A protein has these predicted regions:
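A short, compositionally biased N-terminal segment around positions ~18-40 that is enriched
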Residues: 19-37
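N-terminal acidic leader/helix
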Residues: 1-25
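Alpha-helix boundary/capping and short turn/kink residues
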Residues: 13-17, 33, 53
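Short, charged early-sequence alpha-helical segments and their helix-coil boundaries
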Residues: 36-65
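Generic structural signal for hydrophobic core residues of well-folded globular domains
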Residues: 11-12, 27-31, 47-50, 63, ...
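Short acidic DE-rich linear segments
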Residues: 69-72
Length: 72
């Protein structure tokens, strides 16, 4: 299973500026982000402590669900 970070890199460079791109760009630029993580708890805890924008956790929850479906 690839990491959630790797899954999110598909949203980098999107022409349309949306919340998915915003989160992916932030993850890329944050050198402390747990790039090898696949665990919901590990990633959500990190985001709770280092929230990049107001609704980042909502965006994360939605994208993590899609990640699980695609990776299973």
């Amino acid at each position: 299973m690839r990491s959630f970070y790797h899954y999110m890199m598909r949203y980098r460079g999107n022409i349309q500026a949306d919340e998915e791109k915003r989160l992916a760009e932030w993850m890329f630029e944050d050198h402390s982000f747990p790039k090898q993580a696949t665990s919901y708890n590990e990633i959500s805890s990190y985001l709770e402590w280092n929230i990049p924008f107001t609704n980042a956790l909502t965006v994360f929850d939605r994208l993590y669900d899609a990640y699980q479906i695609e990776e299973d």
